[in-house]
């Protein structure tokens, strides 16, 4: 876990004994060092992979990390894939335009090759049924419907913690405050690589007729209804996300905040109505002056979309 590996080549002569000195620095957490040697290999694995890619109809290229690279209580040294995996992806994609890159990682990574891959699947660390699940998705037995629970940045320097990491004396302050996650990218007007809430499907969905309706819940102060239609040819599931913006807010608050979401299953051509009800708490901010949650009198814009940046419909109401 932790730092990138340091590699070097040493020529050994048969029958001689050698002494090696390995130096490393302990920074106060998880003191450990791993030492290993790779036996000479008559095969050039990069050349073998690219040769196969050149001849194949399509390529499923599985890359990623494991607990040696990312784990709880420890930070990754960079967002690059370990070793020469990025180089491998670049070369394979250049040789075969039908390359599906499968990311078996536990967190975002940089993707210099993003425009070269035909498709990219973020599979996280799915466990022992990974192979069966992956084949079901790739061969269309199952239509994927997951959404990203975090933002994938284009570069490490785009992340909220970049300017303050690693802190001092093993302590780091998260200075973005309320603007965590997608809220940071909204405020700084930084385009992510893949937005919070982004996902793939073999079908398409149309959002329409978003409107304010009378709330039915006893604690609701606003309600919105919309229609969603499966406009494709296969069964699919969509997670409709509802965000709230405050027009001309006098409070230092995020540009928009996810307040509601609902997963809906639709056959080809089928439409359903979805209703989102909002309570005072959904619209409140914490007043440090009054030490209480309060609703700011303002125009509240309700947006629905397929991700934090893929907004399909919006409408507004005045509250307060």
Residue ranges and their predicted role:
Residues 1-320:
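C-terminal non-catalytic regions of proteins with extracellular/luminal or membrane-system context
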């Amino acid at each position: 876990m932790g730092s990138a590996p340091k590699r070097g080549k040493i020529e050994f002569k048969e029958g001689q004994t050698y002494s090696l000195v390995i130096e490393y620095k302990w920074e106060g957490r998880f003191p450990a060092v791993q030492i290993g040697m790779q036996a000479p290999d008559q095969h050039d694995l990069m050349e073998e992979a690219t040769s196969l890619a050149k001849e194949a109809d399509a390529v499923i290229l599985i890359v990623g990390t494991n607990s040696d690279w990312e784990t709880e209580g420890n930070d990754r040294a960079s967002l690059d894939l370990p070793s020469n995996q990025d180089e491998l992806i670049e070369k394979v994609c250049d040789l075969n335009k039908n390359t599906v890159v499968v990311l078996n990682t536990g967190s975002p990574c940089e993707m210099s090759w993003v425009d070269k891959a035909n498709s990219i699947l973020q599979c996280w660390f799915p466990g022992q049924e990974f192979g069966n699940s992956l084949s079901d998705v790739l061969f269309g037995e199952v239509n994927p419907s997951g959404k990203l629970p975090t933002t994938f940045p284009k570069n490490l320097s785009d992340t909220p913690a970049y300017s303050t990491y690693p802190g001092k004396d093993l302590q780091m302050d998260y200075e973005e405050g309320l603007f965590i996650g997608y809220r940071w990218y909204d405020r700084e007007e930084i385009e992510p690589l893949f937005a919070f809430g982004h996902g793939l499907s073999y079908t398409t969905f149309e959002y329409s007729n978003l409107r304010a309706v009378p709330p039915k819940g006893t604690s609701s102060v606003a309600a919105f209804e919309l229609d969603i239609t499966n406009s494709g040819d296969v069964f699919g599931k969509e997670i409709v996300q509802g965000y709230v913006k405050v027009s001309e807010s006098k409070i230092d608050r995020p540009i928009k905040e996810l307040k509601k979401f609902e997963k809906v299953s639709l056959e080809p051509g089928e439409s359903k109505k979805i209703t989102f009800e909002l309570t005072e708490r959904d619209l409140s901010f914490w007043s440090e002056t009054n030490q209480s949650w309060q609703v700011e009198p303002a125009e509240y814009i309700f947006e629905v979309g397929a991700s934090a940046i893929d907004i399909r419909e919006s409408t507004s109401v005045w509250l307060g």
